[in-house]
């Protein structure tokens, strides 16, 4: 449908008024979009190539000095800043007789300036804000000494305005609301500002603050009617132009007196300062002069000049952008709303309030908020959708979208619900997608000036390919063999240890028995690389070159030998002692104060950091990231298997059912029923979720058959980063009868001649990290794309099984070896 629209030419509203066809603009101005679909313009839009070229020419042609000096270069800067300030006011039709513009870092900084000023007034202030407010608007309530109120509906606001008293005295009042919800694009009534002023008169102390950051990204803001305009308007220019990173506070001059009580002053905001016998200072007069502390970000302000020029040349006006983006949003909304599963159930559940009217510029902006549902009504996890979208080069946003009130309201969560979720571990930005049967966040798609119909088509095609169920899911059944002698056994095909978390594997040599501990294979994930600035553990998702860091465990010499990149005669090697108490730790310099906190998979973990510059330089140079090596402390009990997996393992601890001869259903998944008793979960070191990860060669083979059927390249088993790979020991006559995914039915298994017992804890949820080639460090879209179609359980994409050594096996040998026999057990 969309392709037909493209081929027919530009429909009414599509890039209307632009300097040329939008596809031509994109090809020339936005080369960064050549291999990606960008749908997060509400976060930031994109800068044009010619904007950067123009700004670069400006900087290399002109000499700009600090504007606080009187030199020629400084005066040039001052003149340009003054001109651009006026130009920015005119961009919003704001008469400089009635408005002043203060340059700030972003909209949040502008909000804080207003809230700080009212806090410093004699009686403080009362604060009211709309439920659809951005987090930064909500945060201002903490400064309101006279109290605050969240208005949960437009009707509540109207009722409050109706009872405002023009003669009230005491603390000032500030009412803040977004011109457009950054969550779903709903546009709120701008008439509120004028109505509040009419009710309270000019002499009253009730002010309005308009968060215009989301609105102005794709729509004109007209401040020409002074009587109807807000007292304070905040915005960020990068939302409009992509660059520069700069914000503005537009102040209605009649309200500028609130800043007179501001105590702090910075360089450039005063005419004189006395510091010795008398402590006195004289402030400058204009609003922007007393608020712009210190040296302005004058290069960013100068860049705004190029941004205004470029935007006008390419798009003509903000009105053109508004028409173009609302047409695209309407098209996308209609296409998504039409998607149905095989049984007629809707695929997309929108959070758009009343039916969005994209034709009405005062009602709806080009933002869509929604979640996806299965044919049975189950919620598809937002994190899983965003991960898969990233693999397919689609950039979207998920979560609470920095709009806590609007999101909670749309999802039906009360404050008590949210507190309960927080106590259960829910945090902003995590992957707790569904709690108590309801989503914890929302998916957001937003369009911008340079979006086109192909962006719309790409996202619709993505949802159709991966989330529209065209037929019921059917699990295949492997028939049980009539002759038990023909049944396949299993054996350990390979063992892999990952000494440094998220780095390459050390393959245990054939014929060598390897110790296995409660925490997993010996030396597995005992080290990690931590960012020297944040303390967070690095991972391949962000730094795929970590796959090329290849450790080797030399037990004979007692060292961990690390090599980076491809082998060469000049390649350097780092050796770390395996012994914690070894004297060599002095040279590799284990941190003298022993421990510092680090973040691993959301957990706060105490690690021991190597402070040697040689160690940090070795890894930092290769990854081009400031990092160093850290080790999990001995006898630490700070990390355990994830609770969701541990609850499943309780069943296996009590039930040991039939061995491999039992017929099974690969492709289906056992129901994990937690027991009432909860023994201590298995400990882990720096692994993500469990001590051991197991995969099956037969399952990898089946997955690759599916991948190759789509004319794509098969993947190696090592992309799954398993500790144990098991294979079927098939008799010759059953060579073509592998049983892929049979491990999904395993409840427990034994390994080796001593039958070392393992409990299966659950299936391994996969992310886009499996798309990193472990030999080259390159990203691909497989196998995650195929897994998303063939291995989805509810909202999770799974492959492989988590396991741990069973309780009560201390009396037997805890070793495994390549070639050991594996005997699985199945539930009844």
UniProtKB/Swiss-Prot annotation:
The modification N6-(pyridoxal phosphate)lysine is found at residue 239. Residues 638-682 are annotated as: Disordered. Pfam families: Aminotran_5, MOSC, MOSC_N. It catalyses: Mo-molybdopterin + L-cysteine + AH2 = thio-Mo-molybdopterin + L-alanine + A + H2O. SUPFAM superfamilies: MOSC N-terminal domain-like, PLP-dependent transferases. The keyword Cell inner membrane does not apply. GO terms for biological process: Mo-molybdopterin cofactor biosynthetic process. Residues 652-825 form the MOSC domain. Gene3D superfamilies: Aspartate Aminotransferase, domain 1, Type I PLP-dependent aspartate aminotransferase-like (Major domain). It is an enzyme of class 2 (transferase). Its EC number is 2.8.1.9. InterPro entries: Aminotrans_V_dom, MoCF_Sase_C, MoCo_sulfurase, MOCOS_middle, PyrdxlP-dep_Trfase, PyrdxlP-dep_Trfase_major, PyrdxlP-dep_Trfase_small. Its cofactor is pyridoxal 5'-phosphate. The active site is at 402. HAMAP family: MOCOS. Sulfurates the molybdenum cofactor. Sulfation of molybdenum is essential for xanthine dehydrogenase (XDH) and aldehyde oxidase (ADO) enzymes in which molybdenum cofactor is liganded by 1 oxygen and 1 sulfur atom in active form. Belongs to the class-V pyridoxal-phosphate-dependent aminotransferase family. MOCOS subfamily. This is Molybdenum cofactor sulfurase. It comes from Aspergillus terreus (strain NIH 2624 / FGSC A1156).
């Amino acid at each position: 449908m969309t392709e037909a629209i493209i081929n027919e030419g530009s429909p009414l509203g599509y890039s209307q008024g632009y300097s040329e066809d939008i596809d031509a603009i994109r090809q020339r101005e936005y080369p960064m979009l050549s291999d990606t679909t960008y749908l997060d313009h509400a976060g930031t839009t994109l800068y044009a190539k010619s904007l950067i070229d123009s700004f670069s020419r400006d900087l290399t042609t002109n000499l700009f000095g600090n504007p606080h000096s009187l030199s020629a270069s400084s005066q040039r800067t001052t003149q340009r800043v003054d001109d651009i300030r006026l130009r920015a006011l005119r961009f919003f039709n704001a008469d400089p007789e009635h408005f002043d513009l203060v340059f700030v870092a972003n909209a949040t900084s502008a909000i804080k300036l207003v809230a700080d000023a009212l806090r410093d007034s004699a009686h403080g202030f009362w604060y009211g804000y709309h439920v659809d407010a951005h987090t930064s608007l909500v945060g201002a309530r903490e400064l309101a000494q006279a109290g605050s109120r969240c208005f949960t509906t437009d009707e509540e606001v109207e009722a409050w305005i109706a009872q405002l008293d023009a003669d009230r005295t005491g603390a000032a009042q500030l009412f803040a609301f977004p011109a457009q919800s950054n969550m779903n694009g709903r546009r709120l009534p701008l008439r509120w500002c004028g109505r509040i002023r009419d009710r309270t008169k000019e002499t009253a102390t009730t002010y309005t603050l308009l968060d215009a950051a989301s609105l102005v990204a794709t729509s004109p803001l007209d401040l020409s009617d002074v009587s109807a305009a807000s007292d304070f308007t905040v915005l960020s220019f990068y939302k409009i132009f992509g660059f520069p990173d700069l914000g503005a506070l537009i102040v209605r001059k009649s309200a500028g007196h609130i800043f007179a009580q501001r105590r702090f002053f910075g360089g450039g905001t005063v005419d004189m300062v006395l510091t010795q016998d008398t402590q006195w200072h004289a402030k400058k007069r204009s609003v922007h002069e007393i608020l712009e502390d210190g040296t302005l970000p004058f290069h960013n302000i100068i860049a705004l000049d190029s941004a205004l020029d470029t935007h006008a040349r390419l798009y003509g006006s903000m009105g053109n952008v508004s028409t173009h983006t609302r047409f695209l949003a309407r098209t996308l909304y209609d296409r998504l709303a039409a998607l149905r599963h095989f049984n007629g159930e809707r695929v997309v559940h929108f959070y758009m309030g009343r039916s969005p009217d994209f034709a009405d510029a005062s009602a709806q902006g080009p933002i869509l908020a929604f979640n996806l549902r299965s044919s049975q009504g189950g919620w598809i996890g937002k994190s899983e959708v965003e991960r898969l979208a990233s693999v397919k080069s689609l950039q979207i946003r998920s979560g609470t979208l920095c709009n806590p009130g609007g999101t909670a309201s749309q999802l039906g969560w009360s404050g008590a619900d949210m507190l309960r979720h927080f106590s259960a571990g829910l945090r902003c930005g995590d992957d707790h997608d569904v709690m108590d049967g309801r989503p914890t966040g929302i998916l957001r798609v937003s369009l911008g000036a340079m979006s086109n119909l192909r962006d719309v088509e790409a996202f619709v095609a993505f949802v159709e390919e991966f989330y529209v169920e065209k037929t019921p899911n059917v699990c295949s059944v492997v028939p049980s063999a009539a002759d038990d002698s023909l049944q396949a056994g299993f054996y350990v095909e390979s063992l892999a240890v990952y000494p440094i978390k998220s780095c390459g594997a050390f393959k245990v040599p054939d014929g060598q028995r390897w110790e296995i501990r409660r925490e997993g294979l010996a030396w597995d994930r005992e080290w990690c690389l931590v960012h020297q600035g944040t303390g967070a553990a690095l991972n391949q998702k962000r730094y795929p070159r970590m796959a090329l860091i290849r450790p080797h465990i030399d037990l004979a010499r007692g060292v961990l030998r690390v090599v980076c990149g491809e082998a060469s005669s000049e390649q350097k090697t780092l050796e770390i002692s395996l012994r914690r108490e070894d004297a060599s730790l002095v040279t590799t310099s284990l941190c003298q104060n022993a421990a510092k906190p680090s973040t691993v998979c959301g957990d706060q973990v105490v690690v021991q950091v190597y402070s040697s510059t040689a160690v940090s330089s070795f890894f930092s140079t290769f990854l081009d990231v400031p990092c160093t090596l850290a080790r999990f402390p001995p006898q630490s009990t700070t990390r355990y298997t994830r609770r969701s997996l541990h609850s499943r393992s309780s069943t296996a601890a009590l039930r040991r059912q039939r061995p491999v001869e039992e017929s099974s259903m690969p492709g289906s998944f056992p129901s994990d029923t937690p027991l009432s008793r909860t023994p201590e979960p298995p400990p882990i070191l720096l692994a993500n979720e469990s001590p051991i990860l197991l995969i099956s060669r037969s399952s990898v083979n089946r997955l690759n058959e599916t991948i190759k059927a789509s004319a794509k390249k098969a993947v190696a088993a090592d992309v799954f980063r398993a500790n144990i790979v098991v294979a079927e020991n098939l008799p010759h006559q059953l060579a073509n009868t592998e049983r892929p995914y049979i491990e999904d039915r395993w409840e427990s298994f034994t390994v080796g001649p001593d039958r070392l017992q393992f409990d299966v804890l659950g299936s391994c949820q996969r992310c886009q990290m499996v798309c990193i080639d472990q030999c080259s460090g390159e990203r691909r879209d497989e196998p995650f794309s195929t897994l998303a179609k063939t291995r989805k359980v509810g909202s999770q994409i799974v492959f492989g099984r988590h396991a741990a050594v069973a309780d009560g096996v201390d009396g037997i040998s805890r070793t495994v070896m390549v070639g050991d026999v594996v005997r699985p057990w199945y539930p009844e």
